[in-house]
């Protein structure tokens, strides 16, 4: 049996401020650092180990992974970073407070932008200071490939491209894999693995820094999945509560 561990990064500074983050490279909050340490302790206590790790090129996911591996005495594990595991690009909404945006555009419109799978938020323009095309971490991207906004379908497409080309082969070769990424990135993977409908993924919430374990067969089809806590598996439909760590 193959086990895959997915983990959303710990609480970020903009999660704390209730702002749209997307590709903006914000760090973890103090609470997020604590959540990451807790996740590492949970995995260590439950006897997990890893051969390889995957993450995005955004520091909140990278730092979460570093902390998790450090807590597990696995800092030596190879880490592969890719923009294809970045959070969904929220376009011109990036940096805006979610409540203030809802007051400006209406709660229904903002809900559509956030939760529908095929509606993109307003796009950035290339002269916007939030446009990251010249950032060296994206040097492999050509101008027409760099997103100015994304819907969940766009995010899912790049995430699954990376899944099939890099992650799935690692799992099939017998490597123990952890992925530290973002809410919509993990939603995309869960949608694919569990063959969720569009309605199913709309209501799917991924908590910060709680290890989500998938048990897979040899063809990477899910047998079952569950969240982990210090006490082991968490009953389906429940999230473990964070502790002060």
Swiss-Prot record:
<feature type="active site" description="Proton donor/acceptor">
    <location>
        <position position="87"/>
    </location>
</feature>
<feature type="binding site">
    <location>
        <begin position="87"/>
        <end position="90"/>
    </location>
    <ligand>
        <name>substrate</name>
    </ligand>
</feature>
<dbReference type="GO" id="GO:0006096">
    <property type="term" value="P:glycolytic process"/>
</dbReference>
<comment type="pathway">
    <text>Carbohydrate degradation; glycolysis; pyruvate from D-glyceraldehyde 3-phosphate: step 3/5.</text>
</comment>
<keyword id="KW-0324">Glycolysis</keyword>
<protein>
    <recommendedName>
        <fullName>2,3-bisphosphoglycerate-dependent phosphoglycerate mutase</fullName>
        <ecNumber>5.4.2.11</ecNumber>
    </recommendedName>
</protein>
<dbReference type="InterPro" id="IPR013078">
    <property type="entry name" value="His_Pase_superF_clade-1"/>
</dbReference>
<feature type="binding site">
    <location>
        <position position="98"/>
    </location>
    <ligand>
        <name>substrate</name>
    </ligand>
</feature>
<comment type="function">
    <text>Catalyzes the interconversion of 2-phosphoglycerate and 3-phosphoglycerate.</text>
</comment>
<keyword id="KW-0312">Gluconeogenesis</keyword>
<dbReference type="Pfam" id="PF00300">
    <property type="entry name" value="His_Phos_1"/>
</dbReference>
<dbReference type="InterPro" id="IPR001345">
    <property type="entry name" value="PG/BPGM_mutase_AS"/>
</dbReference>
<feature type="active site" description="Tele-phosphohistidine intermediate">
    <location>
        <position position="9"/>
    </location>
</feature>
<keyword id="KW-0413">Isomerase</keyword>
<feature type="binding site">
    <location>
        <begin position="114"/>
        <end position="115"/>
    </location>
    <ligand>
        <name>substrate</name>
    </ligand>
</feature>
<comment type="similarity">
    <text>Belongs to the phosphoglycerate mutase family. BPG-dependent PGAM subfamily.</text>
</comment>
<feature type="binding site">
    <location>
        <position position="60"/>
    </location>
    <ligand>
        <name>substrate</name>
    </ligand>
</feature>
<dbReference type="InterPro" id="IPR029033">
    <property type="entry name" value="His_PPase_superfam"/>
</dbReference>
<dbReference type="GO" id="GO:0006094">
    <property type="term" value="P:gluconeogenesis"/>
</dbReference>
<dbReference type="InterPro" id="IPR005952">
    <property type="entry name" value="Phosphogly_mut1"/>
</dbReference>
<feature type="binding site">
    <location>
        <begin position="183"/>
        <end position="184"/>
    </location>
    <ligand>
        <name>substrate</name>
    </ligand>
</feature>
<dbReference type="GO" id="GO:0004619">
    <property type="term" value="F:phosphoglycerate mutase activity"/>
</dbReference>
<feature type="binding site">
    <location>
        <begin position="8"/>
        <end position="15"/>
    </location>
    <ligand>
        <name>substrate</name>
    </ligand>
</feature>
<feature type="binding site">
    <location>
        <begin position="21"/>
        <end position="22"/>
    </location>
    <ligand>
        <name>substrate</name>
    </ligand>
</feature>
<feature type="site" description="Transition state stabilizer">
    <location>
        <position position="182"/>
    </location>
</feature>
């Amino acid at each position: 049996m193959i086990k895959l561990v997915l983990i959303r990064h710990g609480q970020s500074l903009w999660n704390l401020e209730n702002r749209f983050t997307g590709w903006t490279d914000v760090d973890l909050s103090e609470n997020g650092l604590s959540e990451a340490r807790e996740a590492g302790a949970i995995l260590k206590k439950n006897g997990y180990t890893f051969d390889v790790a995957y993450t995005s090129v955004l520091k909140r996911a990278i730092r979460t992974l570093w902390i998790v591996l450090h807590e597990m005495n696995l800092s030596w594990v190879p880490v592969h970073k890719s923009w294809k595991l970045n959070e969904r690009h929220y376009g011109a909404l990036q940096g805006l407070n979610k409540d203030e945006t809802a007051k400006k555009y209406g709660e229904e419109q903002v809900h559509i932008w956030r939760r529908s799978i095929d509606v993109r938020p307003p796009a950035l323009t290339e002269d916007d200071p939030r446009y990251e095309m010249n950032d060296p971490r994206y040097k492999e991207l050509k101008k027409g490939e760099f997103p100015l906004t994304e819907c969940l379908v766009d995010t899912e497409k790049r995430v699954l491209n990376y899944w099939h080309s890099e992650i799935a082969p690692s799992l099939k070769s017998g490597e123990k894999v952890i992925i530290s990424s973002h809410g919509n990135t993990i939603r995309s993977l869960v949608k694919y693995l569990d063959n969720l409908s569009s309605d199913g993924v709309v209501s799917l919430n991924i908590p910060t820094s709680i290890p989500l374990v998938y048990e897979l067969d040899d063809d990477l089809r899910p047998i079952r999945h569950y969240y982990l806590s210090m006490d082991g598996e968490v009953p389906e439909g429940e999230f473990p509560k964070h502790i002060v760590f």
